From Swiss-Prot:
Residues recorded with modification Omega-N-methylarginine: 310, 320
Protein name according to UniProt: Fibronectin type III and SPRY domain-containing protein 1
Nucleus is among the record's keywords: yes
GO MF annotations, alphabetized: identical protein binding; microtubule binding
Taxonomic path: Eukaryota, Metazoa, Chordata, Craniata, Vertebrata
Quaternary data: Oligomerization is required for binding to microtubules.
Xref: CDD domains: FN3, SPRY_PRY_FSD1
Gene Ontology CC: centrosome; cleavage furrow; cytosol; microtubule; nucleus
Protein's job: May be involved in microtubule organization and stabilization.
Residue span(s) of domain Fibronectin type-III: 164-268
Length: 496
């Protein structure tokens, strides 16, 4: 009995679920019926409006062409009537002269005859009939106003509802990835004059193959494209690839997307490695700020943790409050934090080949800052540019302003104002490290060296801050300058 009740309960549950599904489907069908009525009324209204527009155009054309016929008829009628009136008057004058001549011919008085004959002769000379052109000024042919609308009639008879546009085909051979821009070119398989615009979608990915159904990044949409090409500008290439697809749209409907393509977007990505930074630097992923209390705060926390319960003396420098190298050993390859007066932080990604580019913006009020590259082996007490393990540009705004290139404790003064944003270009295999004004791409300095170890981006700042921009491709202007100036570089050989 209990088993039967349980079975009946299951049946009731199943029926209730099915009833709910059916009710939902019924509601959906009713909504679809309403939508059919509304959408039908909408497209019918649009169709009537389009035909009314065509009718209006035809009526306007008809009135315009009828007016042309009327104007031509009036002009020709006016000319012919004037010519007819002139000829009629000439004929009447000629007939009068003819009658006078006949009467004179029958006269018997010789003296009267001679006088009349002379007058008739003079009258004939001045007669209008002899000065008139007996050729009509205009033609009665109106064939130039004939029409043949057979072709237009066929076009009207071919009117139909808008077809769904075909899917475009992306032309990879004509597409280009350069200067953090992507230029995409596509074409339509069939000529379609009804296409109103195109929609382009793109998203970043780290997967090389065909686009996957699920990605961490959503599709970004660009609408209203009128041509069969488009350039995406101002991109940050923080992932290895980009998926792109395009669809065509007419006034009514959008077609299917093209086959998606995957374009490689090579660029140098790194973050600041906080485990290497001086304690007086507050480091985030791509920015750092000098903090006079940073080392002291760390020292206080360390001492409190050890139970010593006393703070560092206010007169102590940040370097004096820094724990020993053994205690500050970093988890990244045994790299210790920089200390003493080396207010330095390194990037977290090695450069062991190829070309790379990044930009750095320093706070204008920074008292001193530097940027460049260094070997991982750069000592924790060593400042950028003062050993053979690092190359940098250094700006000093404290007491006496200076802008210099430094390597192996050798200095070259640069005859250039300090830009608000600096670009760094490293060509590892060519042994070139170049610095540019990031805005104008003016070359500031180039180091020539033979790099014997992988490099790390390196930065230093005192009483200031900086922001790094990564995910950048080597700009075309920089590549051109490097090729053009490879033989006559601005580098100082004494700094290599």
């Amino acid at each position: 009995m209990e088993d039967q009740r349980e079975a009946l309960r299951k049946i009731i549950t199943t029926l209730a679920m099915k009833n709910e599904e059916t009710q939902t489907f019924i509601y959906s069908l009713k909504q679809m019926l309403l939508n059919v009525e509304a959408n039908s009324a909408k497209v019918q209204e649009d169709l009537e409006a389009e035909f009314q527009s065509l009718t209006s155009v035809l009526e306007e054309l008809k009135e315009s062409m009828l007016m042309k016929i009327k104007q031509d008829r009036a002009s020709r009628t006016y000319e012919l009537q004037n010519q007819l009136a002139a000829c009629t008057r000439a004929l009447e004058s000629s007939e009068e002269l003819l009658e006078t001549a006949n009467q004179t011919l029958q006269a018997s008085d010789s003296e009267d005859f001679s006088q009349a004959a002379k007058e008739i002769k003079d009258g004939i000379t001045m007669a209008p009939a002899f000065r008139l052109s007996l050729k009509a000024k205009v033609s009665d042919n109106m064939s130039h106003l004939m029409v043949d609308f057979a072709q237009e009639r066929q076009m009207l008879q071919a009117l139909k509802f808008l077809p769904v546009p075909s899917a475009p085909t992306i032309d990879l051979a004509e597409s280009l990835v350069s200067d953090n821009c992507v230029t995409l070119v596509w074409h339509m398989p069939d000529e379609d004059s009804k296409i109103d615009h195109y929609v382009l979608e793109y998203r970043k990915t780290n997967f090389e193959g065909p686009p996957r159904l699920k990605e961490d990044h959503p599709w970004m949409v660009v609408e209203g494209i009128r041509q069969t090409e488009h350039t995406l500008t101002g991109l940050k290439f923080d992932m290895k690839y980009m998926n792109i697809r395009v669809k065509a749209c007419n006034k009514a409907v959008a077609g299917e997307f093209s086959e998606p393509v995957t374009l490689e977007t090579p660029a140098f990505m790194f973050r600041l490695d906080g485990s290497t930074s001086h304690q007086n630097l507050r480091v985030e992923d791509l920015s750092a700020e000098w903090d006079a209390m940073g080392g002291k705060v760390q020292d206080i926390k360390a001492r409190e943790k050890e139970g010593k319960g006393r703070t560092a003396s206010p007169v102590n420098s940040p370097a004096r409050g820094t724990p020993s190298p053994k205690r500050m050993s970093s988890g990244r390859g045994g790299r210790d934090r920089f200390t003493a007066e080396s207010y330095t932080v390194l990037g977290d990604t090695l450069i062991d080949g190829g070309e790379h580019y990044w930009e750095v913006r320093f706070e204008p009020d920074s008292k001193a800052f530097g940027l460049g590259v260094a070997y991982r082996s750069l000592g924790r007490f060593e400042q950028l540019g003062k050993t053979a393990a690092s190359w940098c540009l250094h700006a000093n705004n404290w007491l006496q302003a200076s802008f210099t290139a430094k390597h192996a404790n050798k200095v070259k003064v640069l005859d250039s104002p300090v830009p608000d944003c600096l670009g760094v270009h490293c060509d590892f295999h060519q042994g070139l490290l170049s610095f540019y004004n990031a805005r104008t791409k003016q070359l500031l300095h180039t180091f020539k060296a033979k790099f014997t170890q992988p490099l790390l981006p390196a930065f230093t700042v005192w009483c200031g801050s900086f922001q790094v921009t990564t995910g950048l491709q080597v700009p075309s202007a920089v590549r051109c300058l490097q090729k053009r100036g490879s033989a006559t570089s601005s580098s100082n050989t004494s700094l290599t």
